[in-house]
Amino acid sequence: MVVKISKMTQAQAFKILKSGCNVFLTGSAGTGKTFLLNKFIAYLRKKKINIGVTASTGIAATHIDGRTIHSWSGMGIKDKLTDKEIEQLLRKDKLQTRIKETQVLIIDEISMLDASRLDLLDSICKFAKGSFLPFGKMQIIMCGDFFQLPPVDSKNENPAFAYESSAWKNADIKTCYLDKQYRQNDRGFIGILNNIRNNQAGEDTLMKLKARLHQAIKLKTINPIKLYTH
């Protein structure tokens, strides 16, 4: 499958989000993905549009004042359910009503949700809304960076990525790639970070990093940051 990636500004991406199409909002760290997502959420709430604000993890959900997609959809830790099991699941108090009334579903940190669970979510939404269209015809906005955090599945060491799911392929996803960096203004350092992110760090990148090793810090006002793996 060939995916057309359009690099754009936040303003351009915001216009696409408001158009009603299904969107994958992505970009490297510091390009304002979560900022734009929160702006879109505020816009939808102002318009009185029913939205589901979710993320693949609890920590990510707190950044957008939402809940986990596992909780919102009722799937919990399951990665597969039969049609009968989905029907039974939707008998839970308020679950079917919540999904049925949702017009826009937002999932942040989509990279950590594996393909099987995105397919399951698609099935649950279709059942709840009584529609065979992708995600029951609701607009779906997925945000994240597949270069950062991989999907997590305790049963599978190499779970498939969300974009490998049937649900993703059938949803006619528009990819919005934010490329303006707001967290850094050092173009050289941004280049190094992007090379590492894209697995393109060659000898030139390595030499630039090695040049910083054991370099004396002359300014007494600088308190160097120390990073540890544990």
Model regions and ranges:
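Conserved ATP-binding/catalytic motifs of P-loop helicase motor domains
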Residues: 1-230
